[in-house]
Amino acid sequence: MVLSTLIMRASDGLPLSASVDDGQENLSEQKKQCKLVTQKLSANSADRASIESGNYVIHYLMKDGIVYYCISESSYPRKLAFSYLDELDREFQKSHGQEALKEGVRPYKFVEFDTFMQKTKRVYQDTRATHNLDKLNTELQDVTRVMTKNIEDLLHRGHSLDHMSDLSSNLRTESKKYRRAAQRINWEAMIRQYIPFIGVGLIGLFMLWWMLF
């Protein structure tokens, strides 16, 4: 389940909003890590990623200068986590997007956005809900290729989020290559399957032409 949500400005890490009631979980370390991750983000970074942190996973979505984070249990489906973040992005951009990027914005200026976060989070708490399963099958972008990184690798071993973007790009390229190869193989198999019939048909036409002319 989604345990906590944070929204930050990508350019300077300014916290814009956060979920207020995070239950009994102590997520202070993961929240600090979200701030550190924001500092590492750049224009070349992957626009979405999952970062393993102990028993939890930090999912982020970076879009239009804003970074949306949700901290979930490690067993929570990534597809639901990113669908949740996509919904937050759509609503936040509609209501606060332009203002959030202005200079002089105070930290947590949009704390009232928590009302929408809490309402949306409740929809995504039950992974068995029909509504959620429909989203998995119809509305989601393809996040199966979203890279997963370990927080230790990212913060203490200097691994780059830009590298994650490169890996995602490579995966997309490889996927297209294999898809083209599969189409070629299917085409060749179809030719092998029907070429005897085509050959017989051509011979028959030739014999008919020979007899008539």
From Swiss-Prot:
Keyword annotations of the record: Coiled coil, Endoplasmic reticulum, ER-Golgi transport, Golgi apparatus, Membrane, Protein transport, Transmembrane, Transmembrane helix, Transport
Keyword Nucleotide-binding: no
Superkingdom in the source lineage: Eukaryota
Location of the protein in the cell: Membrane; Endoplasmic reticulum membrane; Golgi apparatus membrane
SMART domains referenced in this protein's UniProt entry, alphabetically: Longin (SM01270)
Entry function: Required for transport from the ER to the Golgi complex.
Identification of the protein by name: Protein transport protein SEC22
Organism (species): Yarrowia lipolytica (strain CLIB 122 / E 150)
Gene field: SEC22
